[in-house]
C-alpha cells in the first residue's frame, strides 16, 4: 500500500519514526510532517504566508519524507496535492505522545491530519499512545501494522479510526464512542519585562461520563485499546428535523425574506 504518514509532534518525534519502522518493509511510505511540535492546533491551515518544505532523509530506508513549517492539516493537504507522486491508499497520523480522547479530537492536530485525509476521500487512521510518561511505541506500531495488513484496503473513506492505546500491556480492544471530556483550565497571569500582561494556560481533563463503558475514556482508563469511528459531518440530524418543525410552526420556514 502507498501510505502517507503525518503527526503533530513533529517529524523527529519518536512516535512517527516507530510507526515508519513498523510499516516501511511491506508498504510504500511517505512522511509529510511538521518541522516542530504542533500539538493542539486543530484543523488550522496556513493561508497568509508561504509554506517552507525541506526534504527529510532516512538512512537505509526507502521512505521519502518532507518537513513542513506548517500545521498537521497543512502537511496532509500539501502531501496529497503537491508532494506525493500519486494519491495514497491510506493516511495515518501518529503515533501521538498523549491521549486524544473524547472532545480532544476537536483540538487535536493528530486527528485533524487524519480528517484531512477523509475530506479528500482517503481512508485514515489517527493513533495515540495515551500517556505522556510511558514512551514504548512498539505495541501501538504492531497494532497499526496488523490493522493495515488485515483490512487497510477496506477502511471507509469518509470515516477515520481514532485509536488510543493505554500504557503498558492492554487487556483487550474495544470499539467505542467519543466520551464527554472537558478541561478545568487555569490561566496563570504574568507580566513580561516590558510590563505587558500575558497568560500561560494549563489544565486537567474532567470526564463527565468516565463510568460509561461505551466510551473511549472508560476503555483506556480500564486498560483497553479504544477504536472510535469518527467523521467530519457535525450535523445534528435529530435537531435538524425538530428545527424544521419549530420554524414551520412559527411560520418562518419557507417565508420570503425581505430587506
From Swiss-Prot:
Cell compartments where the protein resides: Cytoplasm
Protein origin, superkingdom: Bacteria
Primary location recorded for the protein, binned into one broad class: cytoplasm
Enzyme class, first EC level, given as a word: hydrolase
A Gene Ontology molecular function term of the record: exopolyphosphatase activity
Cofactor: how and how many bound: Binds 1 divalent metal cation per subunit.
Cofactors named for this entry: a divalent metal cation
Cellular component GO terms held in the UniProt record: cytoplasm
Pfam families according to UniProt: SurE
EC assignment: 3.1.3.5
Binding site for a divalent metal cation: 8-9, 39, 96
Recorded catalytic activity of this chain's protein: a ribonucleoside 5'-phosphate + H2O = a ribonucleoside + phosphate
Keywords, in A-Z order: Cytoplasm, Hydrolase, Metal-binding, Nucleotide-binding
Function: Nucleotidase that shows phosphatase activity on nucleoside 5'-monophosphates.
Protein family (similarity comment): Belongs to the SurE nucleotidase family.
Protein name: 5'-nucleotidase SurE
Organism: Pelotomaculum thermopropionicum (strain DSM 13744 / JCM 10971 / SI)
Amino acid at each position: 500500500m502507498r501510505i502517507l504518514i503525518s503527526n503533530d509532534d513533529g517529524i523527529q518525534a519518536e512516535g512517527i519514526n516507530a510507526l515508519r519502522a513498523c510499516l516501511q518493509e511491506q508498504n510504500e511510505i511517505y512522511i509529510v510532517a511538521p518541522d516542530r511540535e504542533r500539538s493542539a492546533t486543530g484543523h488550522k491551515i496556513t493561508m497568509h504566508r508561504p509554506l517552507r518544505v525541506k526534504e527529510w532523509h532516512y538512512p537505509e530506508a526507502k521512505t521519502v519524507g518532507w518537513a513542513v513549517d506548517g500545521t498537521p492539516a497543512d502537511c496532509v493537504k500539501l502531501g496529497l496535492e503537491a508532494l506525493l507522486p500519486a494519491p495514497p491508499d491510506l493516511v495515518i497520523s501518529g503515533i501521538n505522545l498523549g491521549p486524544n480522547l473524547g472532545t480532544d479530537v476537536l483540538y487535536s492536530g493528530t486527528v485533524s491530519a487524519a480528517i484531512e485525509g477523509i475530506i479528500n476521500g482517503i481512508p485514515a487512521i489517527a493513533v495515540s499512545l495515551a500517556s505522556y510518561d510511558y514512551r514504548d511505541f512498539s505495541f501501538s506500531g504492531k497494532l497499526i501494522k496488523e490493522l493495515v495488513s488485515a483490512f487497510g484496503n477496506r477502511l471507509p473513506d469518509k470515516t477515520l479510526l481514532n485509536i488510543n492505546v493505554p500504557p503498558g500491556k492492554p487487556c483487550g480492544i474495544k470499539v467505542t464512542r467519543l466520551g464527554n471530556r472537558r478541561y478545568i483550565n487555569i490561566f496563570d497571569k504574568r507580566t513580561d519585562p516590558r510590563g505587558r500582561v500575558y497568560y500561560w494556560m494549563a489544565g486537567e481533563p474532567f470526564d463527565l461520563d468516565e463510568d460509561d463503558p461505551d466510551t473511549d475514556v472508560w476503555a483506556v482508563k480500564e486498560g483497553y485499546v479504544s477504536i472510535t469511528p469518527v467523521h467530519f459531518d457535525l450535523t445534528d440530524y435529530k435537531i435538524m428535523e425538530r428545527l424544521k418543525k419549530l420554524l414551520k410552526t412559527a411560520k418562518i420556514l419557507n417565508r420570503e425574506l425581505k430587506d
